[in-house]
Design a protein with these regions (language model features):
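Hydrophobic alpha-helical connector segments
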Residues: 57, 71-100, 153-160
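Amphipathic alpha-helical segments used for helix-helix packing
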Residues: 81, 96-118
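Generic hydrophobic, amphipathic alpha-helix propensity
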Residues: 8-17, 33, 58-62, 66, ...
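Helix-turn-helix
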Residues: 11, 19-53, 57
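Amphipathic C-terminal alpha-helical segment
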Residues: 92, 96, 140, 160-173
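Solvent-exposed, amphipathic alpha-helical segments
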Residues: 15, 19-23, 69, 110, ...
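Amphipathic alpha-helical packing segments from all-alpha helical-bundle domains
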Residues: 72, 80, 117-143, 155
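N-terminal intrinsically disordered/low-complexity leader segments
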Residues: 1-7, 150
Length: 173
């Protein structure tokens, strides 16, 4: 009979999100993860599929928080919600202005070396979600007459996403 778990998966993930955000995927070794989580290498492998699985779970938690808090107002918003989102990127102390940059941007940059298809999909999904939120706000503003009907909303949203990536990269420096 298997022993019952003496840990909460969400508590374990909560403990590693910040560590991965601060140090990156490659810089955190399995021994450090064992110390942070209280789990041994076997438990990390069986519960999360190893270090990469734990990282993906942490990245997913981070993304869900950003989507449900920072991005959410743009889903039904217009220009003011986009402005508020962008201002938060440069407002010290906000979730989106961390000295560690953005975990998603950091993951994308680091994955150029790691070359994990799973990480690539997770990063792309986040940026697609952000772009969809920008499109929603821009389209609402266009319907409301705040943006000329001739403006390509998708191109504008794509440009905003690129700008967000740049700000997050700059925040890390």
């Amino acid at each position: 009979m298997a022993r019952p778990k003496n840990y909460s998966v969400s508590d374990v993930v909560e403990r590693v999100v910040f560590a991965f955000w601060q140090h990156g995927y490659q810089s955190l070794g399995v021994r450090e993860l064992e110390e942070l989580t209280g789990l041994n290498q076997y438990a990390i492998r069986t519960e999360f599929g190893g270090k990469e699985g734990l990282y993906l779970t942490a990245l997913e938690m981070y993304c869900e928080r950003a989507i449900s808090s920072a991005m959410a107002p743009m889903k039904d918003g217009k220009i003011p919600e986009i402005i508020a989102f962008l201002q938060a990127l440069v407002t010290k102390g906000s979730m989106t202005s961390s000295q560690f940059g953005c975990l998603v941007v950091n993951t994308g940059i680091e994955n150029a070396r790691v070359n994990s298809p799973r990480l690539e999909v997770a990063v792309a999904r986040y940026w697609d979600t952000l772009e969809a939120h920008f499109v929603a706000s821009l389209r609402n503003a266009q319907i409301d007459g705040q943006i000329d009907p001739a403006v390509d909303i998708e191109a504008m949203a794509n440009g905003l996403v690129s700008g967000v990536m740049g700000v997050h990269t700059k925040n890390r420096v």
